């Protein structure tokens, strides 16, 4: 996406981001238009209503359709996309929020600006903490997804996004639906409940013998056995 193109409004940029997210784009790049010397668009800049910087990199400053402040918003939106959507760990939850709520991008952008974070370099962990804080305030139903992303990114289970995770002496349930990996008794389990039913939630298994922060096993606990579910004991026998 290119902000500053003739006839291209800020509202359309937000719409196009949502469209690309709907197509499961691996990355969404948003850049500012630059009018390089010798190009046709630079020669027609006045005709097209484009004002641009006379100094390199010759970025567009304003058009008939997008103001100086709106171009600044587009630049900040680009930062948001790079930090969250274009980062594997946070892409799935960011995509879901973009698609589920038309106002998410503007609300999250406003949050990052108010916190003076939009132009600050943030570690992977910091971005997860920020996203969890934001969802806790504005999208509490999505906190569980942020926590799952946090765990699968190998983040600390002692930090706020993992506040609901149970780690001590966790034993597998009678039945679960395996999402990935193979269960074995040597795995260190943690459990993320999704409601008051202690069996309803997600199980993650970590290798105890190797220094690997990411889980190697994931399953969803269920109340009774049905198709596509396994007993941990049966699965253990197969993998031992």
Feature-to-residue mapping (PLM):
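A structural motif corresponding to the C-terminal lobe/cap of the Radical SAM core domain
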Residues: 1-102
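Radical SAM enzyme core and accessory elements
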Residues: 79-240
């Amino acid at each position: 996406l290119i902000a500053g193109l003739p006839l291209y409004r800020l509202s359309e940029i937000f719409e196009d981001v949502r469209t690309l997210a709907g197509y499961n784009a691996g990355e969404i790049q948003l850049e500012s238009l630059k009018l390089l010397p010798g190009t046709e668009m630079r020669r027609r800049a006045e005709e097209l209503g484009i004002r641009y910087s006379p100094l390199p990199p010759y970025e567009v400053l304003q058009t008939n359709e997008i103001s100086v402040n709106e171009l600044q918003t587009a630049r900040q939106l680009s930062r948001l996309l790079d930090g969250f959507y274009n980062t594997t760990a946070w892409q799935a939850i960011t995509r879901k929020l973009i698609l589920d709520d038309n106002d998410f991008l503007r609300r999250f952008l406003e949050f990052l600006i108010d916190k003076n974070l939009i132009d600050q370099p943030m570690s992977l962990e910091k971005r997860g903490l920020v996203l969890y804080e934001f969802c806790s305030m504005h999208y509490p139903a999505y906190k569980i997804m942020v926590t799952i992303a946090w765990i699968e990114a190998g983040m600390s289970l002692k930090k706020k996004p993992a506040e609901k995770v149970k780690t001590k002496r966790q034993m597998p349930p009678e039945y679960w639906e395996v999402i990935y990996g193979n269960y074995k008794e040597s795995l260190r389990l943690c459990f993320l409940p999704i409601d008051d039913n202690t069996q309803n939630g997600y199980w993650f298994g970590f290798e105890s013998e190797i220094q690997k922060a990411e889980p190697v096993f994931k399953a969803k606990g269920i109340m009774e056995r049905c198709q596509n579910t396994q007993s941990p004991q049966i699965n253990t026998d197969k993998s031992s």
